[in-house]
Curated annotation (Swiss-Prot):
This is Glycine cleavage system H protein. The lineage of its organism: Bacteria, Bacillati, Cyanobacteriota, Cyanophyceae, Nostocales. It comes from the Bacteria. SUPFAM superfamilies: Single hybrid motif. Its cofactor is (R)-lipoate. InterPro entries: 2-oxoA_DH_lipoyl-BS (IPR003016), Biotin_lipoyl (IPR000089), GCV_H (IPR002930), GCV_H/Fam206 (IPR033753), GCV_H_sub (IPR017453), Single_hybrid_motif (IPR011053). NCBIfam families: gcvH, PRK01202.1. The glycine cleavage system catalyzes the degradation of glycine. The H protein shuttles the methylamine group of glycine from the P protein to the T protein. The gene is gcvH.
């Protein structure tokens, strides 16, 4: 059994990003599983405030001592906030990936898009099969 958390109020991509929808604002980050797989994160590239994300497209990169990975948008919308703490100290994502370790806040175009992402149980089945 996995020791990773998969909060039920989030939706997930099989590429290990999550989205939390609160009204028309979506919070985007990466999962605890992804943080574990990456190891020590050393660099994070995120879009600027005002940039448009398109669901399924790459919006940034995360670099660790093990790998460089693309970050994929789970939803379409405009970036309204980015976590500047992670820009300065990208390794802070490991401390609280579902809380203080979020990457972006996005004003969504269509909140129903979130339903295309995996539920916590579906995501758990994906990662435990890896």
């Amino acid at each position: 059994m996995s020791s990773f958390e998969y909060p039920q109020d989030l939706r997930y991509l099989d590429t290990h990003e999550y989205v939390r929808l609160d009204g028309e604002i979506a919070t985007i980050g990466i999962t605890e599983f992804a943080v574990d797989q990456l190891g020590d994160v050393v660099f994070l590239e995120l879009p600027d405030i005002g940039d448009l994300l398109t669901k399924g497209d790459t919006f940034g990169t995360i670099e660790s001592v093990k790998a460089v990975e693309d970050l994929n948008a789970p939803i379409t919308g405009t970036v309204v906030e980015r976590n500047e703490i992670l820009i300065e100290s990208p390794d802070a994502v490991a401390d609280d990936p579902y809380g203080e370790g979020w990457f972006l806040k996005v004003r969504v175009n269509d909140p129903d898009e979130v339903n295309d992402a995996l539920t916590a149980d579906e995501y758990r089945a994906e990662v435990e099969g890896e």
